[in-house]
Regions:
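…; additionally, a secondary subgroup of soluble metalloenzymes is captured
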Residues: 1-437
Length: 440
């Protein structure tokens, strides 16, 4: 205690020449007697007010004085040093006063300290508050900074909300309990109500979180939600912050069924959801609807490619990246099939067409199969797989095979002008390396 008193008094003397100290409980005499600070003279009020005033104002006008009274502060009418006291500062030696002195707070901030004493009991919290404080802070702003410290945040109310959402996702309530112990709960909910429109007779943070997800989803679809537009901005910033990705996914999964999102999606055209990613089920719904539309060929290739490109911004895109890529390659395959001319008038023309364009159909088909199998969500692509497989087999492989068969049926010699046979390729390109026993 004596060290903190010494530090608090030292800070006061950095800004004031005179410091008054009233020992109301008469239990600080030892602390006063032990106080020593270079350049500071200790004096005691004991019926000698006029003598002290003359000394401090006339005899030693530059000297710094600690003016101590062993007892309470007199009423104003009987305080003969009141004019000096009003022009300087009074040191109060109770714990709240020490905290105020440490923070350099003026008297009008006394309630900010005395109403929230639990907050100030930890030096780490007081030190954090010091870092955040601004000279222009109001009492409300000070309490908001205290909320940020309790939540481990470093900004305004929005960052407090983000931190508390993270704690909620982790199944913890340490910050909320500290806010309660610090006497900041009522102020917190008042601020939340004013900022985001949350109203409840019995406010609860999980209830607020559910309302936040519900409102963000509704407002993203141009509908009204229980919270205001400012809440949507906070939600978006939190959702898109990589630091909170895990917390967002946890709460999104927790509230998806609670808010009956899967049932709601069944009533919506997936085109209205392309820019929305508040729940994982949205991606699955969009994928199913695109696959169905592609399977029945009721959407154009440019439309599908645009939707897939827009979904790259989705929070869940990395999880479904192979499905989206499979859809893209299936779309390109179908588009290429629609534009392909699979006829040939000679074997040479058939080979030339394959190496210049038809090979892309094989390539797109194989990329579709690769990403579908890699996705681990094969069932989502089942209808599209059937459509692509049927078209690849019957409209491409079978068509090319029939046309090719017609051309080679009339050949007396298996040679195609301008293209080397396998035997010629080996002789011209590979045999030389084998003779030198080289690996290729």
């Amino acid at each position: 205690m004596s060290e903190r008193i010494h530090a608090s008094l030292a800070r006061m003397f950095d800004e004031h020449r005179l410091v008054f100290w009233y020992d109301t409980a008469r239990d600080m005499r030892e602390a006063f007697d032990s106080f020593v600070l270079d350049g500071v003279e200790k004096v005691e009020i004991s019926g000698n007010e006029f003598g002290l005033k003359y000394r401090m104002l006339r005899q030693e006008p530059k000297q710094r004085f600690l003016i101590y009274k062993d007892g309470p502060e007199p009423v104003m009418a009987e305080n003969w040093l009141l004019d000096l006291q009003l022009a300087t500062v009074v040191f109060k030696a109770d714990q709240a006063a020490i905290w105020m002195a440490e923070l350099g707070l003026p008297a009008q901030f006394e309630s900010v300290v005395r109403e929230h004493t639990e907050f100030y009991r930890a030096k780490v919290r007081v030190d954090a508050l010091k870092r955040f404080m601004q000279a222009s802070d109001t009492q409300t702003q000070m309490r908001l900074r205290m909320l940020a410290v309790c939540a481990g945040a470093e900004g305004g109310l929005d960052t407090v909300i983000e931190a508390l959402l993270g704690e909620l996702a982790a199944g913890k309530d340490d910050a909320l309990r500290l806010i309660e112990r610090s006497g900041l709960t009522e102020m917190f909910w008042t601020q939340v109500g004013q900022a985001y429109g949350y109203r409840s007779d019995e406010p609860d943070f999980e209830d607020f979180a559910i309302s936040l997800f519900q409102s963000a989803y509704a407002r993203a679809l141009a509908e009204d939600g229980p919270l205001n537009a400012e809440a949507l901005l906070v939600f978006r910033r939190w959702k898109n912050n990589r630091h909170w990705a895990g917390a967002f996914e946890e709460l999104s999964a927790r509230y998806q069924d609670l808010l009956k999102i899967p049932a709601d999606l069944l009533k919506r055209d997936f085109r209205t959801l392309v820019a929305t990613d508040h729940f994982e089920e949205i991606d699955r719904h969009i994928i199913r609807q695109i696959v169905q539309a592609m399977s029945t060929q009721t959407v154009s290739a440019p439309e599908v490619l645009t939707w897939v490109r827009e979904r790259r911004q989705s929070h869940w895109y990395p999880k479904y990246v192979d499905i989206y890529q499979a859809i893209s390659f299936a779309t390109e395959f179908q588009q290429a099939m629609a534009e392909a001319n699979l006829g040939m008038t000679s074997p040479a023309e058939g080979v030339k067409r394959y190496v210049t364009s038809w090979y892309k159909l094989d390539q797109l088909y194989r990329k579709f199969i690769y990403h579908m199998q890699k996705s681990s969500h094969v069932s989502l692509l089942a209808d599209l797989y059937d459509a692509v497989e049927n078209r690849y087999t019957n409209s491409f492989v079978l068509a090319v095979n029939d046309a090719w068969q017609d051309q080679i049926a009339g050949l007396s010699e298996w040679k195609i002008p301008g293209f080397a046979s396998q035997a010629d390729f080996y002789r011209d390109q590979a045999a030389e390396y084998r003779r030198k026993d080289q690996k290729v």
